[in-house]
Curated annotation (Swiss-Prot):
Its cofactor is [2Fe-2S] cluster. GO terms for biological process: iron-sulfur cluster assembly. CDD domains: IscU_like. It is found in: Mitochondrion matrix. Belongs to the NifU family. This is Iron-sulfur cluster assembly protein 2. Pathway: Cofactor biosynthesis; iron-sulfur cluster biosynthesis. It comes from Arabidopsis thaliana (Mouse-ear cress). GO terms for molecular function: 2 iron, 2 sulfur cluster binding; iron ion binding; structural molecule activity. The keyword Ligase does not apply.
Length: 163
């Protein structure tokens, strides 16, 4: 379940009152769109051998991100899910990452950099760590998937030798 530290709609939209009483937007519309309408929220069964899970966090701000990939036999990511506890920028970064990796191969997603996510969302420098979490979560999910596959293949090879 996604949760936010900010409690008001005004706070998470990044609206700040000016002396004239007019709102000033601090977040780009891409952040607001992915925050208000996050894509691919949820989770897969961690025990599924075709699912890789990346769980990363930022101790400094308390953001926590779980990103999961479902991979087919050819090594293509066919589906993805995420759950993020953190600010709107962290949720938006997770949502963008989950969209970008779907349909790509494991090798292709390993080339996605946080700077690309940050540029797309137009994150301010103080929020760059959110896009770094997304990049780290992608890499962690791929690593987890590959480790599962190596164990599965080793177990299958051992069974073949026994037979």
């Amino acid at each position: 379940m996604m949760m936010l530290r900010q409690t008001s709609r005004k706070a998470y939209l990044g609206l700040q009152a000016s002396p004239l009483g007019l709102g000033r937007r601090l977040y780009h519309e891409n952040v607001i769109d992915h925050f208000e309408n996050p894509r691919n929220v949820g989770s897969f069964n961690r025990n599924d051998p075709n699912v890789g899970t990346g769980l990363v966090g930022a101790p400094a701000c308390g953001d926590l991100m779980s990103l999961q990939i479902k991979v087919d036999d050819s090594g293509q990511i066919i589906d993805t899910r995420f759950k993020t506890f953190g600010c709107g920028s962290a949720i938006a970064s997770s949502s963008v990452a989950s969209e970008w990796i779907k349909g790509k191969t494991l090798d292709e997603v390993m080339t996605i950099k946080n700077a690309e996510i940050a540029k797309h969302l137009r994150l301010p420098p103080v929020k760059l760590h959110c896009s770094m979490l997304a990049e780290d979560a992608i890499k962690s999910a791929v690593r987890d998937y590959k480790e599962k596959q190596a164990k599965t293949n080793a177990a299958a090879a051992e069974e073949t030798v026994k037979a």
